[in-house]
């Protein structure tokens, strides 16, 4: 059987960089990983509660974390200014306080910045979230996939593949459906491929969404 490797990990050091950057002694490694997970969960939960638009669409493309001895720098990359949390300055300060409490680490400063992405539909996380929202609203999975591909094409991507697995349209037997448009060269290391996997809870059960986007070739 074919062995599937994560496209992001496969390209680390060439076309992809680490989303979390820090150094630790082996005995502290697991604690740092758990800390990263707490930061990501806390930010996503806060944004979900305090969004300007109550559609359930967070629009977070990715989170970048950099740690130093006395500082944790978190960068939130978002797709649209309409999805910014209420009152940017006050909201970021509240978010920073929430994350600091969750980490229970007062000897390090926490700095959070928000960066807007120029072409949001070039980001697989945002497209996956869009598809998930459509599926929750009982839109046909094929229609949701085709619309996501249209949005990606408008962002001038070179290729995209969208895959959904589970009890599609409420059928009793789970299956996998996918659509590809353009080139998605997964075996070419110099090809910059963005990838994400996303789970969505629907009335028929859990569906898994995977998206590969061919951005450029170096």
From Swiss-Prot:
The keyword Thylakoid does not apply. One of its GO terms (molecular function) is structural constituent of ribosome. Its main location: plastid. PROSITE patterns: KH_TYPE_2, RIBOSOMAL_S3. GO terms for biological process: translation. Residues 47-118 form the KH type-2 domain. InterPro entries: KH_dom-like_a/b, KH_dom_type_2, KH_sf_prok-type, Ribosomal_S3_C_sf, Ribosomal_uS3_bac-typ, Ribosomal_uS3_C, Ribosomal_uS3_CS. One of its GO terms (cellular component) is cytosolic small ribosomal subunit. It is found in: Plastid, Chloroplast. Keywords: Chloroplast, Plastid, Ribonucleoprotein, Ribosomal protein, RNA-binding, rRNA-binding. Part of the 30S ribosomal subunit. Belongs to the universal ribosomal protein uS3 family. HAMAP family: Ribosomal_uS3_B. This is Small ribosomal subunit protein uS3c. It comes from Amborella trichopoda. The gene is rps3.
